[in-house]
Design a protein with these regions (language model features):
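Short, flexible/disordered intra-domain loops and linkers
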Residues: 42-51, 135-139, 199-204
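Secondary-structure boundary elements
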Residues: 27-31, 90-98, 103, 171-178, ...
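A glycosyltransferase accessory/donor-loop signature
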Residues: 1-2, 155-158, 175-310
Length: 310
């Protein structure tokens, strides 16, 4: 039976988030290949991996085949996503009917069959925090002007939603969308000057969040079906049951819950979700460290009931 493939990219302490993603995949019922592109040293939870050609490492984990691929592109990992997905599909998983990408600060809360359905017959996406971007919004009009300068025709100019680049599910029939996304990111470098950072300029810049803006511009250039959830799909708003995305610099594996709460930033839903997937099959923390994290999160959440920044 052909199985879908899941990918992520990480460097630095984001390997702790990637371990939480693996644990959540396992809890969801996913069994198959999980491809990790990484920069720097292998994480501690990859130590039992076996060496394979091209310097890759493979670890089997109760039905999940974790493949570690060393990378060192000259651009920020977030701008490397479509390139990595295309390479993984071609070189590692050419038989996969679908490929998924999730940022390493995301965990999955739903059963895997829901994830499979999400990318059935269309591209699986989740709306971003700032999700409404109507067809005649000035930013979108600027994108239209830029597309004309690139001799690209926007076939779906009436898109009105703005989607997160932290998650995408692509069926094989829509594989060419990844090529378009990759191409637009490369063209964006002529505007931004480089692709070595997540952000560029200010919120009104043509490309502010480069990979994410390029993703949404690519959606204007194709009539591919979009299978989307609202922003609650990543726990940006309450009521979500699909994914949980710990956006921003306050990552749950770094702790600091009490300090942040006293500054008016209570623990996010994503912080709570991450700790739910911190124990198995990969123990991310020692028992004592996890107990402390959970205790401080509980206290910080209590403080947040009475004090938070508006």
């Amino acid at each position: 039976m052909l199985t879908s493939v899941v990918c992520t990219l990480f460097e630095g302490d984001y390997h702790l988030g990637a371990a939480g993603l693996v644990n959540s995949l396992h809890a969801s019922g996913f069994r198959g290949r999980f491809i990790c592109g990484y920069r720097g040293a292998l994480p501690f939870w990859a130590e039992s991996s076996k060496s394979e050609p091209n310097a890759t490492k493979v670890r089997m984990l109760d039905g999940i085949e974790i493949i570690f691929v060393p990378l060192n592109p000259a651009i920020h990992f977030t701008n490397y996503k479509p390139t990595f997905l295309l390479e993984a599909w071609k070189e590692i998983a050419p038989d996969a009917p679908k490929i998924y990408y999730l940022d390493p600060d995301i965990v999955i809360k739903c059963p895997w069959d829901v994830m499979e359905r999400w990318a059935e017959g269309g591209i699986g996406l989740c709306e971003d925090v700032n999700f409404y971007l109507p067809p005649r919004h000035p930013i979108r009009l600027a994108w239209h002007d830029w597309l004309r300068s690139q001799n690209i025709i926007p076939h779906a100019s009436q898109r009105e939603r703005y989607y997160s680049g932290g998650f995408i599910g692509v069926p094989i029939a829509a594989r060419s969308f990844l090529e378009l996304w990759r191409d637009l990111i490369a063209r964006a470098a002529d505007i931004t000057g480089s692709l070595d950072s997540i952000k560029h300029g200010n919120p009104t810049s043509l490309f502010h969040t480069i990979d994410q803006d390029a993703l949404n511009i690519a959606l204007m250039c194709t009539d591919v079906a979009i299978n989307a959830s609202g922003p609650e799909g990543m726990d940006f708003f309450s009521g979500g049951s699909l994914l949980s995305h710990a956006v921003g610099s306050r990552k749950p594996w770094r702790g600091g819950f009490l300090t942040n709460a006293l500054r008016g930033y209570p623990p996010s839903m994503a912080s709570k979700a991450f700790l739910n997937y911190a124990t198995e099959p990969i123990p991310i923390f020692s028992s004592l460290s996890l107990m402390r994290l959970k205790a401080t999160l509980t206290l910080a959440a209590f403080i947040g009931r009475f004090y938070r920044r508006s």
